[in-house]
């Protein structure tokens, strides 16, 4: 095993990377409230794992979406637990994100030179809410259907481009299969890639600039 480790160490400098990660200075004023961002990340990782597991059984069609969710809940081994954890973790992720935003704002963590970290965090918040909106519709039950109906109809109030935006969200002039397909694609592909990119940027900025000082 030592020879294997030495082989990788020679090429990747694992020890230097580990020392850099573990030796980062943590200011003395940091308390449990500074962990809210990390808890939000943990919730996202749980979301990713449980969501990925459900993609093996979920069917994104208006005819089979609801029955496939019922199948996950009633027939798949531990399916009820996986979906329940997905729902609970989604609520926890939003709650932790809100508390994290409040903590950063109240402690002045958005001030110079951390403006870009704040902006990327706001974008991450928007993406998180978008996850909630798109995921809410996927069971395609009465609640999900009418939620999509309302959400996709809101932009119609915007002058000139409102109808175009609504049609883009729905995939047509009315809510149907195209709408479910778009929401499913956004929830399982587009938004995960977006949040991964902005999370990476967010963490690199924090790593570079460190934790903000006390007020």
Curated annotation (Swiss-Prot):
One Pfam family cited in the UniProt record for this chain: Cytochrome_B
Binding residues for heme b 1: 100, 202
Cystine pairs: none
Molecular function as annotated in GO: electron transporter, transferring electrons within cytochrome b6/f complex of photosystem II activity; metal ion binding; oxidoreductase activity
Record InterPro entries: Cyt_b/b6_N (IPR005797), Cyt_B6_PetB (IPR023530), Cytb/b6-like_sf (IPR027387), Cytochrome_b_N_euk/bac (IPR048259), Di-haem_cyt_TM (IPR016174)
Cellular compartment(s): Cellular thylakoid membrane
Topology of this chain in the membrane: Multi-pass membrane protein
Residues reported in the UniProt entry to bind heme c: 35
Role played: Component of the cytochrome b6-f complex, which mediates electron transfer between photosystem II (PSII) and photosystem I (PSI), cyclic electron flow around PSI, and state transitions.
Additional observations: Heme 1 (or BH or b566) is high-potential and absorbs at about 566 nm, and heme 2 (or BL or b562) is low-potential and absorbs at about 562 nm.
PANTHER family: CYTOCHROME B (PTHR19271:SF16)
Family, per entry: Belongs to the cytochrome b family. PetB subfamily.
Subunit structure: The 4 large subunits of the cytochrome b6-f complex are cytochrome b6, subunit IV (17 kDa polypeptide, PetD), cytochrome f and the Rieske protein, while the 4 small subunits are PetG, PetL, PetM and PetN. The complex functions as a dimer.
Protein name: Cytochrome b6
Gene: petB
């Amino acid at each position: 095993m030592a020879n294997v480790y030495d082989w990788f160490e020679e090429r990747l400098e694992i020890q230097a990377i580990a020392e850099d990660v573990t030796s980062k200075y943590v200011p003395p004023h940091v308390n449990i409230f500074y962990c809210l961002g990390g808890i939000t990340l943990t919730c996202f990782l749980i979301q990713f794992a449980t969501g990925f597991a459900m993609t093996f059984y979920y069917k994104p069609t208006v005819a089979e979406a609801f029955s496939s969710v019922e199948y996950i809940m009633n027939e798949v081994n531990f399916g009820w637990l996986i979906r329940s954890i997905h729902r609970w973790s989604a609520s926890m992720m939003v709650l932790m994100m809100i508390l994290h935003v409040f903590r950063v704002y109240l402690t002045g963590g958005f001030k110079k030179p951390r403006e870009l970290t704040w902006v990327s965090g706001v974008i991450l918040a928007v993406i998180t809410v978008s996850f909630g909106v798109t995921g809410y519709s996927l069971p395609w039950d009465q609640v999900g259907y009418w939620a999509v109906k309302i959400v996709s109809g809101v932009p119609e109030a915007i002058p000139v481009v409102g109808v175009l935006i609504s049609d883009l969200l729905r995939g047509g002039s009315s809510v149907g299969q195209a709408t479910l397909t778009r929401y499913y694609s956004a929830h399982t592909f587009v938004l995960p890639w977006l949040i991964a990119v902005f999370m990476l940027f967010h963490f690199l900025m924090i790593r570079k600039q460190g934790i903000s000082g006390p007020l």
